[in-house]
């Protein structure tokens, strides 16, 4: 019985964490990261790297720069795909850029 409860709690925790990760990346409305207009909305730099890893497995980060477009902050991450193609991926970082970080956010 104790083992069943442990397994159930582990599954519930895993599902909760998976749900949190998916809400940190917003690709609705055709947001594919191909331009400022189609920038992927993210809640953290970690979400940027997760998005890149999910969409361009085994790519390499060439550079990352913070810039503004129409008064809004963006991260532009330059990657080299595994087949050697250079590509820029645009992220809307307005949810967290220059916002106060609390100790609870770091856990």
Tell what function each PLM region has.
Residues 16-19:
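C-terminal motif of bacterial Sec signal peptides marking the signal peptidase cleavage site
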Residues 1-9:
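Bacterial N-terminal signal peptides that target proteins for export
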Residues 66-107:
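Short, compact, well-ordered microdomains
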Residues 34-50:
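Solvent-exposed, low-complexity, repeat-rich "mucin-like" stalks and linkers
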Residues 25-27:
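Intrinsically disordered, low-complexity, charge-dense segments enriched in Lys/Arg
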Residues 54-65:
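Charged, amphipathic alpha-helical segments
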Residues 32-34, 106:
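Extended, charge-rich alpha-helical interface modules
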């Amino acid at each position: 019985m104790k083992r069943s409860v442990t397994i159930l709690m582990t599954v519930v925790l895993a599902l909760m964490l998976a749900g949190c990760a998916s809400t940190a990346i917003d690709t609705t409305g055709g947001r594919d990261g191909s331009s400022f207009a189609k920038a992927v909305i993210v809640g953290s730099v970690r979400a940027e790297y997760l998005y890149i890893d999910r969409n361009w497995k085994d790519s390499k980060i060439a550079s990352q720069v913070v810039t503004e477009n129409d008064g809004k902050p963006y991260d532009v991450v330059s990657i080299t795909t595994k087949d050697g193609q250079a590509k820029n991926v645009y992220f809307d970082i307005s949810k967290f850029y220059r916002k106060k970080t609390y100790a609870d956010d770091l856990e």
